[in-house]
Amino acid sequence: MLHIICFHLFNDYSGSPKVLKMILEELLKKGYQVDLISSKGGVLDELLHYKNLRKHSCSYRFSNNPAITILRYSTVQIYTFLLAFRWLFHKDVVFHINTLLPVGPALAGRIMGKHVVYHYHENAFVKGAFYKALATIMQKLAHEIICVSEYQASFLQRKKGVTVVPNALPKNFVNRLTPNLQTAFERKQILMLGSLKLYKGPLEFIELAQRLSQFTFELVVNDTQENINRFVKEHKINICKNLTIYPQQNDVAPFYNQASLVLNLSDRKQFVETFGLTVLEAMTAGLPVIVPTEGGIAEMVVD
């Protein structure tokens, strides 16, 4: 049976680790041995009760200071590159590289002659030179590339060994959703889930709340309360009575069950969604969504 060695740097509650958790959970239930190399404190930690999973922790997180982020990134690449060689003499090993970031272990895998599979969640070609370089390296190192949308795959020069597999939702999440169109309409509650990155539209969402006092607005941020407070202070935001901002949540199903409409306000001039897991979650909950007109996210929505 195959032995899966999975590398994912930043373990939080965003889309890519959620999808990875679902994949690994199915593999673990089928009896596969999985070694997971990732940071602490996110959704992937919910897999630790499986006896056939071994977790190797690496220290990695983002910083508001780009120089510190680059230093942390470089350090974790060296660490994971060297760590990967512990499986040098293991047979039937597959290196699963989740997102573009773990380039160090991908390189180590190719040096050792292991089968390297990338699960590509980003769209590097609408980002900066750094991500474009990582995407170029991915196309050289990967035996297989899994994309999450046709839009995303269309930017790759390489076509061989590229598969499009749209993201899905775990059954235990879907089972907690309780769609009720009538009560949802009556609530007049607007929901958005995302990060504090400006291109994700948090300021625009807050402005909508200020202008539309007849609606209730909820913003669920994939970040700590401390960083939310800093963001509010930095941008001199006045939190109006009809707006509630929540920090990182382990379970977002209750928010969908109380919502009437879900927004994705990503600025397509600065950032194009490759998929949009929150939109899939919202539609599964029977909720209408408003999304950008470009990118993988637009493949899911019909006017």
PLM feature spans:
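Short N-terminal targeting/anchoring amphipathic segment
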Residues: 5, 73, 84-102, 117
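A conserved mid-protein helix/loop that constitutes part of the nucleotide-sugar donor-binding site
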Residues: 14-25, 188, 195-211, 277
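Glycosyltransferase donor-sugar binding loop
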Residues: 36-43, 169, 193, 217-231
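An aromatic- and histidine-rich active-site surface loop
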Residues: 43-44, 76-80, 94-112, 127-128
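Carbohydrate-associated surface elements
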Residues: 151, 168
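Nucleotide-activated donor-binding/catalytic signature segment of Leloir-type glycosyltransferases, i.e.
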Residues: 230-249
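Acidic donor-binding loop of glycosyltransferase active sites
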Residues: 257-272, 287-288
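Short hydrophobic beta-strand element within catalytic cores of glycosyltransferases
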Residues: 264, 279, 284, 288-291, ...
